UniProtKB/Swiss-Prot annotation:
Keywords: Activator, Chromosome, DNA-binding, Nucleus, Telomere, Transcription, Transcription regulation. Residues 332-365, 395-428 have a biased composition (Low complexity). GO terms for molecular function: DNA binding; transcription coactivator activity. This is Transcription factor RBF1. Residues 1-36, 258-281, 328-365, 395-433, 470-527 are annotated as: Disordered. The keyword Transcription regulation applies. Belongs to the RBF1 family. Residues 160-300 bind DNA. Disulfide bonds: none annotated. It comes from Candida albicans (Yeast). InterPro entries: Mediator_comp_sub12. It is found in: Nucleus; Chromosome, Telomere.
């Protein structure tokens, strides 16, 4: 039995091994090349082949081996089929992706083409709009030229009528006619006030008639000639108003009308008044009044240019009536104020005179003191009538100062101030070292009179001459100060021209009265 088994073992592998190798080779070739599913291993065929080759005793073992080999072959075939299916799915996915990419590219191309078409269409529309606007401008320009050409004869006609109206020579027998034709637009305005002002102040004088308002409505104002019969007037009395109306009633057919034309925006805003931009003032500003001629023909002659008109400015304006008691009260107040002003002026003049008199008295007292001091310092003998001489000098100085104050009160203040300002430094500077020439002349005259025993009248005459000399010198000095020193050195007109100009004229007169003609050289040293 054992020997038979060994033989069978030795015999079987030869056939089975060859079969397995063949099967493995076939499976390897299929796996490498990727054979189709038609080359599948059949276990029945394999078992039939093995049974035909092997003997009958070994039939069971051969079938067992063939079954195992068949299962492995079927597994390999299933794996190959799965791989083939996976590859097919991968290929299908690749094809789908390619189709999607192709579709996306087509969509992009379509969109680009559509955008280009839209841009071209928009450009064409813009070009058409520009062409349309250019054509409209050309049409408007042509219409404007045509209107100007058509208006030229009308303008020439209006200018001719205007020239005829502006000339002073016009036929009073012909009826007045406007320079505007029927249904012609005269002018446009932005407000009703401008319209009325133009018609009243400009159009009326140009038309040689007075234009009045017949009726006024919110959207229309009707104008007519004053002589048409019914018009507005400011006369309150009914009888006077009726008389004025009848005097000017002539049934004139001259008519004008002004209509209000609101803008389209205002019409739209009326439907929506709640908008924030809606404003009544803006709507008023945007309104437009159009003045149009209805009937340019009058039935009367034009008013003459030199027509006498009542001048309102020539009337005198009276604030309150004169006959009322209040006016008398005002007049009395004015008179009282004038009297008070006069009294104040008189008081001021009296105060000025009083001040001037007091200043003159002070000056006279100062002069007397100076003379007494100079006499005491000179050491000359006093005369019995020297006190009378001083009294007469004071009285004469007061009289002359009063006369000068009556005629030259305003000048006296300046002169006294300048004299005081000049006398004070002179007195402090010079003192008794340099005596006055007039005082020395008076002292010498008094001494000579005492020696000659001619009495007190000569002494007084000498003193008077000395006083006149001092006053004349002061008067000349004041004139020189007022005139700026231009007439310095002028001789008084009251002095005799035969006197020596180098010697004091008062001293010369005194010497002539005493017969002293050859003593000028001695006294000239004191001058």
């Amino acid at each position: 039995m054992s020997s038979n088994k060994n033989q069978s073992d030795l015999n079987i592998p030869t056939n089975s091994a060859s079969l397995k190798q063949k099967q493995r080779q076939q499976l390897g070739i299929k796996s490498e090349i990727g054979a189709s599913t038609s080359d599948v291993y059949d276990p029945q065929v394999a078992s039939y082949l093995s049974a035909g080759d092997s003997p009958s005793q070994f039939a069971n073992t051969a079938l067992h081996h063939s079954n195992s080999v068949g299962y492995s072959a079927s597994a390999a075939a299933a794996a190959a089929e799965l791989q083939h299916r996976a590859e097919l799915q991968r290929r299908q996915q690749q094809l789908q992706q390619q189709e999607l990419q192709h579709q996306q590219e087509q969509l992009q191309q379509y969109r680009q083409a559509q955008a280009q078409a839209q841009a071209q269409a928009q450009a064409q529309r813009e070009h058409q709009q520009l062409q349309h606007a250019y054509q409209q401008q050309q049409q408007l320009h042509q219409l404007g030229q045509l209107s100007q050409q058509l208006a030229q004869p009308h303008l020439s006609q209006h200018e001719h009528v205007r020239d005829a109206l502006t000339t002073d020579e016009f036929d009073t027998n012909e009826d007045l006619r406007s320079r505007y034709i029927e249904n012609e637009i005269v002018k446009t305005f932005n407000s009703k006030a401008e319209l009325v002002h133009f018609v009243k102040n400009e159009l009326g004088p140009e038309e040689r008639c007075k234009i009045v308002i017949n009726s006024s409505k919110p959207k229309a104002v009707y104008f007519q000639c004053e002589r048409s019969g019914s018009f507005r007037t400011t006369v309150k009395d009914a009888t006077k108003r009726q008389r004025i109306a009848y005097t000017k009633r002539n049934k004139c057919a001259y008519r004008l009308v002004a209509n209000l034309y609101p803008n389209e925006k205002d019409q739209k805003r009326k439907n929506k008044p709640d908008e924030p931009g809606h404003n009544e003032e803006n709507s008023r500003i945007s309104e437009m009044w159009v003045l149009r001629m209805i009937n340019p023909q009058h039935n009367h002659a034009p008013d003459p240019i030199n027509k006498k008109k009542r001048q309102k400015t020539s009337r005198t304006l009276v604030e309150k009536p004169i006959n009322k008691p209040h006016h008398h009260h005002l007049l009395q107040q004015e008179q009282q104020q004038q009297q008070q002003q006069q009294q104040q002026q008189q008081q001021q003049q009296q105060q000025q005179q009083h001040n001037a008199n007091s200043q003159a008295q002070q000056q006279a007292a100062q002069l007397q003191q100076q003379m007494q001091q100079q006499l005491q310092a000179s050491g000359l003998p006093t005369t019995p009538n020297y006190s009378e001489l001083l009294g007469q000098l004071g009285q004469l100085s007061q009289q002359q100062s009063q006369q000068q104050q009556l005629h030259h009160i305003p000048q006296q203040r300046q002169r006294t101030q300048s004299q005081q300002s000049q006398q004070q430094p002179q007195q402090t500077a010079h003192g008794l070292d340099q005596p006055d020439a007039a005082v020395i002349a008076a002292i010498e005259a008094s001494a000579a009179a005492a020696v000659a025993s001619q009495g007190s009248p000569n002494v007084t005459a000498a003193a008077v001459a000395a006083l006149q000399h001092t006053q004349g010198n002061e008067h000349d000095a004041q004139q020189q100060q007022d005139r700026g020193g231009n007439n310095g050195g002028a001789i008084d007109s009251n002095v005799d021209p035969s006197l020596d100009p180098n010697v004091d004229p008062n001293v010369q007169a005194h010497d002539h009265s005493h017969g002293l003609r050859n003593s000028y050289g001695k006294r000239s040293g004191f001058l």
